[in-house]
Design a protein with these regions (language model features):
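Multi-pass membrane catalytic core of lipid/isoprenoid biosynthesis enzymes
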Residues: 10-14, 56-120
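C-terminal ends of transmembrane helices
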Residues: 52-61, 116-128, 177-185, 229-230
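Single conserved hydrophobic/aromatic residue that forms the stacking wall/gate
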Residues: 1-4, 8, 228-236
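C-terminal membrane-associated helical module and adjoining short loops/tails
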Residues: 129-230
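Helix-coil boundary and interhelical linker segments in multi-pass alpha-helical membrane proteins
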Residues: 25-37, 82-106, 147-164
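Topogenic membrane-insertion module of multi-pass membrane proteins
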Residues: 5-48
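Hydrophobic alpha-helical transmembrane segments of polytopic
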Residues: 13, 39-40, 107-110, 114, ...
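Generic transmembrane alpha-helix signature in multi-pass membrane proteins
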Residues: 21-28, 50-57, 79-84
């Protein structure tokens, strides 16, 4: 039937998201950060069109919802965790921290754990049909991918203390499950009229992409997150 065909189309796109996420994991484990970011971006594109198809075709199913969450936790939870894990392994550890150097990299998997919690929360939260509460997992993954790929040399230098990275992991893990309302790029369709704010946001992002290149994703996500934090300080 037509309805079943629409569901299969959506699930195919979800599987492409998962496939790209698996490749991102391999690239991250091999410390090929730019390639890992590339496949996370590809996963986020598939995830975007997955949601767009679901809304445009009304192609919703219980299996599709579960499959989407599983794909997202690999692409946007495990992949960025492996990026940060590999980075921790490369970082300079002062003599006073040598005892913790073999163990600290595993803190990177807090990203996977809190991404799974965020996805489970999202699946059962009726407030998030048109906007987000807490940082979306694709945004978190793009932040880590672009930060590490764009500022790798600085992050592995003696000027960057591993504790700073650990604090950042904890902060963004908390943002994933926080009660802070966040901007959403959910498109109902591709018309300007129905998605004016989202299109304007994308246009504003262009200068970031031009001037900051790979690091632009991190800069955009930090800027948006900071804006929401300031706007909702009472939540803190």
């Amino acid at each position: 039937s037509s309805a079943a065909s629409d569901v299969y189309k959506r699930q195919t796109v979800t599987c492409l998201n998962l496939f790209s996420g698996c490749i991102a994991c391999v690239m991250a484990f091999e410390a090929k950060y730019e390639l890992a970011l590339l496949f996370i971006v590809l996963s986020s594109i598939f995830d975007f069109f997955d949601g767009l198809l679901a809304r445009a075709l009304n192609a919703h199913s219980i299996i599709g919802k579960d499959l989407d969450s599983l794909a997202d936790d690999v692409s946007f939870g495990v992949a960025p965790s492996l990026i940060v894990f590999s980075l921790f392994k490369e970082m300079y550890y002062p003599a006073t921290m040598e005892f913790i150097a073999p163990y600290l990299p595993y803190a990177a998997f807090l990203i996977s754990v809190f991404s799974a919690l965020r996805l489970a929360k999202f699946n059962n939260d009726t407030r998030q049909t048109s906007s987000f509460v807490g940082l979306p997992v694709p945004a978190n993954a793009l932040f880590w991918g672009s930060l590490v790929a764009g500022a790798h040399d600085l992050l592995v230098s003696e000027t960057c203390h591993p504790v700073y990275l650990f604090i950042l992991v904890c902060l963004f893990s908390w943002l994933l499950v926080s009660e802070i309302p966040m901007f959403s790029l959910k498109f109902k369709n591709l018309s300007w009229k129905d998605n004016k704010i989202s299109f304007i946001f994308l246009i504003i992002c262009i200068p970031f992409l031009v001037f900051l290149e790979i690091a632009s994703f991190a800069a955009i996500i930090v800027s948006v997150s900071y804006t929401h934090l300031r706007a909702h300080e009472t939540v803190l």
